[in-house]
């Protein structure tokens, strides 16, 4: 059972996932800091509050902290956009490699077709003689 677990952990997918989770957590903390310390104050200038998370309204005893939600929405949009850009770049990279492989495959098919034609000619001339 220990060996099976070791094989599972050492597979590329599990390691890639672990690295992705750690990088995602680090990236999220950076984006959160940027939103809280840079973007939030800029928006806060126009909203009338320096700290967006302090924006709130009350209805009776209920307090609605919409500033904190606004911070999280901005975080989500930034992280989502950057992930979109990363995936777009990865797809573009794989598409270029796929085109190269297709071109190589086409040249291999042409070469094999030419070899087959020559073998047919060779067999026909051998059979006639």
From Swiss-Prot:
- Main localization of the protein? membrane
> What is the gene called?
mscL
Please give the name of this protein: Large-conductance mechanosensitive channel
Which NCBIfam families did the record assign? Answer: mscL (TIGR00220), PRK00567.1-3 (NF001842)
Record keywords, A-Z: Cell membrane, Ion channel, Ion transport, Membrane, Transmembrane, Transmembrane helix, Transport
Question: Where does the sequence pass through the membrane?
Answer: 8-28, 30-50, 67-87
Q: Which organism is it from?
A: Oenococcus oeni (strain ATCC BAA-331 / PSU-1)
Gene Ontology cellular-component terms for this entry are: plasma membrane
Bilayer topology term: Multi-pass membrane protein
Quaternary structure and partners: Homopentamer.
Q: Molecular function terms in GO for this entry?
A: mechanosensitive monoatomic ion channel activity
| Location in the cell | Cell membrane
Whether Calcium counts among this entry's keywords is no
- Protein family according to the UniProt entry: Belongs to the MscL family.
Keyword Protease listed = no
Under HAMAP family, the record lists:
MscL (MF_00115)
Function, as annotated: Channel that opens in response to stretch forces in the membrane lipid bilayer. May participate in the regulation of osmotic pressure changes within the cell.
């Amino acid at each position: 059972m220990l060996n099976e677990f070791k094989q599972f952990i050492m597979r590329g997918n599990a390691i890639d996932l672990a690295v992705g989770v750690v990088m995602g957590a680090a990236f999220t903390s950076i984006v959160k800091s940027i939103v809280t310390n840079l973007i939030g104050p800029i928006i806060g200038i126009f909203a009338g509050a320096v700290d967006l998370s302090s924006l709130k309204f009350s209805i009776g005893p209920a307090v609605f902290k919409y500033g904190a939600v606004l911070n999280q929405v901005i975080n989500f949009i930034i992280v989502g956009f950057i992930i979109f850009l990363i995936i777009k770049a990865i797809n573009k990279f794989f598409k270029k490699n796929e085109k190269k492989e297709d071109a190589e495959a086409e040249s291999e098919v042409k070469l094999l077709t030419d070899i087959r034609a020559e073998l047919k000619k060779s067999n026909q001339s051998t059979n006639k003689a």
